[in-house]
Amino acid sequence: YVNLYGGIDMDTMQGLKRTHYCGDVEGIGNEVVVGGYVQKVRDLGNLIFIDLRDRTGIVQLAFDDSTDREIFEKASDCHSEYVLMAKGVVRERESKNTAIKTGNIEIDVKDLRVLAKAQTPPFEIVDDTNVNEELRLKYRYLDLRRKVLQDNLIMRSKIAKVARDYYYEKGFIEIETPMMIKSTPEGARDYLVPSRVHHGKFYALPQ
């Protein structure tokens, strides 16, 4: 354990390396290591199920009577948006979930690491969250964890790559210089940097 961030005990990733993203887990009997955010915890007493989420999807972590007691208790203390690393064996899921890609399998957890704890978020991190835009913008870093917004960012990245690849193939060179970037009204804050060439003048560098 390490003791950081106000005395909260958290685990390290030492000895674990991710083998699969949550949405890509497959192969019954395979040993896998996954990491991500806690989407939901279902504590049924002698059974605990945790939906673990990353940008590719969700996979269910399972804890039962065969689980090491320390790991079981650690799972029972988990809450929404905790960051976990889990190692275990893929097995068939008794209660199938056709709504997700990994709905036919689950991970029988043998090792669980709590990498970061979290307070209860101001709104639920789901695509159909019912919250006003002002609150979403205030907690933009949480809002961007929702898949619908991540899909937009991924699409934007792909479009930008296609455009760049096209111009690179045509012999264009991409440059970024503050003298060719115009400040925008109501845009990001500008930083004023003195010019070493034109004394008494400044560059306005958009944040």
Question: What positions do the PLM features span?
Answer:
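Class II aminoacyl-tRNA synthetase catalytic cores and aaRS-like
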Residues: 1-207
